[in-house]
Amino acid sequence: MGNILNQIGIENYIFLSVVLFCIGVFGVLYRRNSIIVFMSIEIMLNAVNLLFVAFSTYHQDAQGQVFVFFSMAVAAAEVAVGLAILVSIFRNIGSISIDNLKNLKG
């Protein structure tokens, strides 16, 4: 990976990470479907993970890659819990639109 990083350059990884993060922010702010919002959050997390891997490779340190491994495990658990909640909400309400979720009362 070090050779590829030297050939491509860390600036391109930073640019790609920023673009992915902005796409995720756009999806969170402007979409009304809960599944699309979850996917956008995952895109944002993957953008940060890409940046961690690029910086850890650039500095020849494996701590960033280890952190990404644990971050991906937590993200997988987050998706499992989030989708289970969405399935439960869909069974009760019949919709997963964020506008319809505002009517839920605790």
UniProtKB/Swiss-Prot annotation:
One of its GO terms (biological process) is ATP synthesis coupled electron transport. Keywords: Cell inner membrane, Cell membrane, Membrane, NAD, Quinone, Translocase, Transmembrane, Transmembrane helix, Transport. The chain crosses the membrane at residues 8-28, 35-55, 66-86. It is a multi-pass membrane protein. Its EC number is 7.1.1.-. It comes from the Bacteria. Its main location: membrane. GO terms for molecular function: NADH:ubiquinone reductase (non-electrogenic) activity; quinone binding. Pfam families: Oxidored_q2. It is found in: Cell inner membrane. GO terms for cellular component: NADH dehydrogenase complex; plasma membrane. It catalyses: a quinone + NADH + 5 H(+)(in) = a quinol + NAD(+) + 4 H(+)(out). NDH-1 shuttles electrons from NADH, via FMN and iron-sulfur (Fe-S) centers, to quinones in the respiratory chain. The immediate electron acceptor for the enzyme in this species is believed to be a menaquinone. Couples the redox reaction to proton translocation (for every two electrons transferred, four hydrogen ions are translocated across the cytoplasmic membrane), and thus conserves the redox energy in a proton gradient. NDH-1 is composed of 14 different subunits. Subunits NuoA, H, J, K, L, M, N constitute the membrane sector of the complex. PANTHER family: NADH-UBIQUINONE OXIDOREDUCTASE CHAIN 4L, NADH-UBIQUINONE OXIDOREDUCTASE SUBUNIT ND4L. Belongs to the complex I subunit 4L family. This is NADH-quinone oxidoreductase subunit K. It comes from Flavobacterium johnsoniae (strain ATCC 17061 / DSM 2064 / JCM 8514 / BCRC 14874 / CCUG 350202 / NBRC 14942 / NCIMB 11054 / UW101). The gene is nuoK.
